[in-house]
């Protein structure tokens, strides 16, 4: 009998993607984050679906419906804690996945990389609209501050902001449409992830050495399925520890108070995974300038493939580029730390200085380091 997984039209696709897929034999644990992101997405969609069954997107009842889920729904507290902390795990994996792509030169698969950047933006949009749904103080004021940035766009800004709000301020119409967006976007992310995989499998996976691995490939199953399963277990362990022992560790205490348009929290800040962008936004005194800087900080990823000057793909054997990469990582951690602090000295001056090395490192220093490393590899040395 002919093996069904190799002949059946549907099984054939799964076989070529997850079973008989030729994979480089030397890919490290840094390549686990793609599958971990897939698992995070499935967890978020499933927990989100059950939460949506009990949530009401109305300004009068949204906050109490979340309290009702946690108190009265069977395991509702667990669903909510898994969903809220699942978002943190999602972004942790995302940042590590993007960092791995930059370090090992995976961005040279341009189509895969560009779809990945679009995915990052879509996930950020989903997380933002999702954070508004519990209708706590920080949800409301976060939505007000961020959507109000649209009014910085010349000519059409105010009209655009009011169109998004569905009125003259963040209110019932805004909450209803944000719930609709938050429900549909994960399915769009799922479709984009399939396209991301499609482009990846056109070229095959990159590997730590950055050289062509065609001479030494192994089947994906059982080697990498077992490796991914270990990653799944570790991620689930961390997520469950977080959701069961310290579910509010990464949240904001202000969000335990219902939204009050007449009372501004002392310090408005987003979730931890947006703090780096928030720090860049606050670093520029001009409203439009801040918006453009935040957009540039994410969209700069799209031009990274064009800035690759090194003869070697990976940073594995490029110590100067490695040093700059880790300085960039430290810079992003600094920005995240600054974004979580109130606007007062010394945080103001650090916040104004920190975005400069971020852009300088990506646009100037790393391309120059690549050229320098090429020069040092010349035979006369």
Curated annotation (Swiss-Prot):
A GO biological-process term: mitochondrial electron transport, ubiquinol to cytochrome c
SUPFAM superfamilies attached to this UniProt entry: a domain/subunit of cytochrome bc1 complex (Ubiquinol-cytochrome c reductase), Transmembrane di-heme cytochromes
Cofactor annotation comment: Binds 2 heme b groups non-covalently.
Residues binding heme b b562, per UniProt: 83, 182
Disulphide bridges, residue numbers: none
A Gene Ontology cellular-component term: respiratory chain complex III
Membrane topology qualifier: Multi-pass membrane protein
Gene Ontology molecular functions: metal ion binding; ubiquinol-cytochrome-c reductase activity
Residues bound to a ubiquinone: 201
TM spans (from-to): 33-53, 77-98, 113-133, 178-198, 226-246, 288-308, 320-340, 347-367
Pfam family for this entry, one: Cytochrom_B_C
Key words, A-Z: Electron transport, Heme, Iron, Membrane, Metal-binding, Mitochondrion, Mitochondrion inner membrane, Respiratory chain, Transmembrane, Transmembrane helix, Transport, Ubiquinone
Binding-site residues for heme b b566, renumbered to this chain: 97, 196
UniProt subcellular location: Mitochondrion inner membrane
Cofactor(s) in the UniProt record: heme b
Domain of life, source organism: Eukaryota
Function: Component of the ubiquinol-cytochrome c reductase complex (complex III or cytochrome b-c1 complex) that is part of the mitochondrial respiratory chain. The b-c1 complex mediates electron transfer from ubiquinol to cytochrome c. Contributes to the generation of a proton gradient across the mitochondrial membrane that is then used for ATP synthesis.
PANTHER family cross-referenced by the UniProt entry: CYTOCHROME B
Family under the similarity heading: Belongs to the cytochrome b family.
Other remarks on this protein: Heme 1 (or BL or b562) is low-potential and absorbs at about 562 nm, and heme 2 (or BH or b566) is high-potential and absorbs at about 566 nm.
Quaternary state and interactors: The cytochrome bc1 complex contains 11 subunits: 3 respiratory subunits (MT-CYB, CYC1 and UQCRFS1), 2 core proteins (UQCRC1 and UQCRC2) and 6 low-molecular weight proteins (UQCRH/QCR6, UQCRB/QCR7, UQCRQ/QCR8, UQCR10/QCR9, UQCR11/QCR10 and a cleavage product of UQCRFS1). This cytochrome bc1 complex then forms a dimer.
Name used for this protein in its record: Cytochrome b
């Amino acid at each position: 009998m002919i093996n069904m997984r190799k002949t059946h039209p549907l099984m054939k696709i799964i076989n070529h993607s997850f079973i008989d897929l030729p994979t480089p034999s030397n890919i490290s644990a840094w390549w686990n984050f793609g599958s971990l992101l897939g698992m995070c997405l499935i967890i978020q969609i499933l927990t989100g679906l059950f939460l949506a069954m009990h949530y009401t997107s109305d300004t009068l009842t949204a906050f109490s419906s979340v309290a009702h889920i946690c108190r009265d729904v069977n395991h509702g507290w667990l669903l909510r804690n898994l969903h809220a902390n699942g978002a943190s795990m999602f972004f942790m994996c995302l940042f590590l996945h993007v960092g791995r792509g930059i370090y090992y030169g995976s961005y040279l698969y341009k189509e895969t990389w560009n779809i990945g950047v679009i995915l990052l933006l879509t996930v950020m949009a989903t997380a933002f609209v999702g954070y508004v749904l519990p209708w706590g103080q920080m949800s409301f004021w976060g939505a007000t501050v961020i959507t109000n940035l649209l009014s910085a766009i010349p000519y059409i800004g105010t009209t655009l902001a009011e169109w998004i709000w569905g009125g003259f301020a963040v209110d019932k119409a805004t909450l209803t449409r944000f719930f609709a967006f938050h429900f549909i976007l994960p399915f769009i992310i799922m479709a984009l992830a399939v396209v991301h995989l499609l482009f990846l499998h056109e070229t095959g996976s990159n590997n730590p050495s950055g050289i062509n691995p065609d001479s030494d490939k192994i089947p994906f199953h059982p080697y990498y399925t077992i490796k991914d399963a270990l990653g799944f277990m570790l991620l689930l362990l961390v997520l469950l520890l977080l959701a069961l022992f310290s579910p509010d560790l990464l949240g904001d205490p202000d969000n335990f108070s219902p939204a009050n348009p007449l009372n501004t929290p002392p310090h408005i800040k987003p979730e931890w995974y947006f703090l780096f962008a928030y720090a860049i936004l606050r670093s520029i005194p001009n409203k439009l300038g801040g918006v453009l800087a935040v957009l540039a900080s994410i969209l700069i990823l799209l031009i990274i493939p064009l800035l690759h000057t090194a003869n070697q793909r990976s940073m594995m054997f490029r110590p100067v580029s490695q040093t700059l990469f880790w300085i960039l990582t430290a810079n992003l951690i600094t920005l995240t730390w600054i974004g979580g602090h109130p606007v007062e000295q010394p945080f103001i001056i650090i916040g104004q200085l920190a975005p400069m090395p971020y852009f300088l490192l990506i646009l100037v220093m790393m391309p120059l380091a690549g050229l320098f490393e090429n020069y040092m590899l010349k035979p006369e040395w």
